[in-house]
Amino acid sequence: MAFKLRIWLWSTNVRSLENVVEQIRNIANKTGIRMRGPVPLPVKRLEVPVFRLPHGEGSKYWEHWEMKVHKRLIDLEADERVLRHLMRIKVPEDVYIEIKQMTG
């Protein structure tokens, strides 16, 4: 029985993210299932200003730290065999995955 899956991937490291997307693409090509995506979603930019005080005399200034979160979206029409293949993917620690079954 085939069902639709929506896979959300996000990471701060683009290379790791693209590596996981490529593994999913290879599984889709090998098994012959329909795959839509990967759809690149807008990059979320998080900026944290930190007030920095020097020791002794001197001027006060702000440091700005930044983190970018890259996201991808993939839709698959999968069966149990494909789902087993997806669970065996080696995912780096800095890549987060969310898989949901779509209805309709």
UniProtKB/Swiss-Prot annotation:
Cysteines paired by S-S bonds: none
Pfam families, per the entry: Ribosomal_S10
InterPro entries, per database record: Ribosomal_uS10, Ribosomal_uS10_dom, Ribosomal_uS10_dom_sf, Ribosomal_uS10_euk/arc
GO-annotated biological processes: translation
GO terms of molecular function: structural constituent of ribosome; tRNA binding
GO annotations of cellular component type: small ribosomal subunit
Keywords: Ribonucleoprotein, Ribosomal protein
Keyword Protein transport among UniProt keywords: no
Subunit structure: Part of the 30S ribosomal subunit.
Family the entry assigns: Belongs to the universal ribosomal protein uS10 family.
Function, in words: Involved in the binding of tRNA to the ribosomes.
Name of the protein in question: Small ribosomal subunit protein uS10
Lineage of the species this protein comes from: Archaea, Thermoproteota, Thermoprotei, Desulfurococcales, Desulfurococcaceae
Gene responsible for this protein: rps10
